[in-house]
């Protein structure tokens, strides 16, 4: 997962936003 963070930072950010939206509502 760490290597993916450096290779695909945008994808990782999208994952965080997606999970954040799921948690909010």
Swiss-Prot record:
Superkingdom of the organism of origin: Eukaryota
Recorded family membership: Belongs to the peptidase A1 family.
Tissue: Highly expressed in the placenta between day 60 and day 100 of gestation.
Keywords: Aspartyl protease, Glycoprotein, Hydrolase, Protease, Secreted
Protein's cellular compartments: Secreted, Extracellular space
Species assigned in the record: Ovis aries (Sheep)
GO biological process, one term: proteolysis
Protein known as: Pregnancy-associated glycoprotein 59g
Location (main, coarse): secreted
CC terms in the record's Gene Ontology section: extracellular region
Enzyme type, top EC level: hydrolase
Residues listed as glycosylation sites in the UniProt record: 4
Further remark: On the 2D-gel the determined pI of this protein is: 6.1, its MW determined on 1D-gel is: 59 kDa.
EC number: 3.4.23.-
Gene Ontology molecular functions: aspartic-type endopeptidase activity
Coiled-coil intervals, chain numbering: none
